[in-house]
Design a protein with these regions (language model features):
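Phosphate-binding/switch region of NTP-binding enzymes
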Residues: 168-228
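Loop/turn-to-beta-strand initiation segments
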Residues: 52, 78-80, 131-134, 164-174
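Short acidic, S/G/P-rich loop/turn micro-motifs used as interaction or catalytic elements
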Residues: 31-35, 61-62, 88-89, 141-149, ...
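Glycine-rich P-loop/Walker A and Walker A-like loops and their local beta1-loop-alpha1 context
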Residues: 2-68
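Conserved beta-strand segments of the P-loop GTPase G domain that flank and frequently precede/overlap
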Residues: 25-30, 55-57, 82-84, 136, ...
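P-loop NTPase catalytic phosphate-binding loop
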Residues: 63-106, 110
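Phosphate-binding/switch loop-helix module in NTP-utilizing enzymes
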Residues: 90-158
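Substrate-engagement module of ASCE P-loop NTPases
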Residues: 147, 151-179
Length: 228
């Protein structure tokens, strides 16, 4: 990561605030930048803050992110991967990382319960929410390709409620407000903070909700940096 990428990371981490408090944080990110922001978040949370976390791959098989992390010298050792897409896509390549699989993106409602069961029954296995400090999903919006909106909304509510039961778990949720306004508004109602990655960075309260609101410069920091 170059200096511009680090500046972006620092801006986002500043917006997240006290990560020990956990909770769901909404990030308004252009869909073309999901991979870049994922890498920056994983660098900041996993390496800089040494937080063990879970990365849930919905958009692409988990091996893709493992490859990008290693290519950009971001150590995936503290990460556990939950792969939602590989069994559906038929990708069977090994990524040499801790990984658990669920039965495809059409069964998204089963994911929160699967995480609960894994955490309750496995002390030192692939997934243990009790040892997790954050959970990041690569592309929430892509779930709408495989499920109707009501199922995705139910998943999102159940997912955040599950994380609330593990009070210290942070959940950054990346959604493109312009492309998925309905999902964005649903997520906004469930989150404790909103980070809008457009225009100039400034800290102001949201007019409607009064929740903390952060604007980050429109990816000028990452131009010429990480290539997703």
């Amino acid at each position: 990561m170059n200096e511009k990428d680090v500046r972006l990371m620092n801006s986002i981490m500043s917006g997240l605030g006290d990560t020990t408090q956990g909770g769901a944080v909404l990030l308004d990110v252009k869909s073309t930048q999901f991979v870049r922001v994922s890498l920056v978040l994983l660098r900041g949370l996993s390496e800089e803050l040494q937080m063990p976390g879970i990365f849930i791959s919905v958009d692409r098989p988990y091996q893709y992110m493992v490859h990008l992390l290693r290519m950009h010298q971001i150590n995936p050792a503290k990460l556990t991967f939950i792969d939602v897409i590989s069994r559906f896509s038929g990708d069977r390549k090994e990524g040499n990382a801790n990984v658990g699989f669920v039965d495809g993106p059409f069964h998204v409602n089963s994911l929160p319960e699967a995480l609960r069961q894994w955490s309750a029954t496995i002390d030192n296995g692939v997934v243990n929410l009790k040892n997790c400090r954050f959970v990041l999903i690569d592309n929430l919006t892509s779930l709408l390709t495989y499920n109707n909106y009501s199922h995705v909304e139910l998943f999102l509510r159940d997912f955040i409620e599950m994380l609330k039961s593990n009070a210290n778990v942070l959940a950054p949720l990346m959604i493109d407000q312009e492309r998925s306004p309905l999902l964005y508004e649903t997520a906004k109602s469930l989150c404790t903070k909103e980070i809008v990655m457009k225009e100039e960075m400034r800290q102001v309260p949201t007019a409607a909700s009064g929740k903390p609101y952060l604007k980050v410069a429109d990816f000028r920091y990452v131009q010429g940096g990480i290539q997703g």
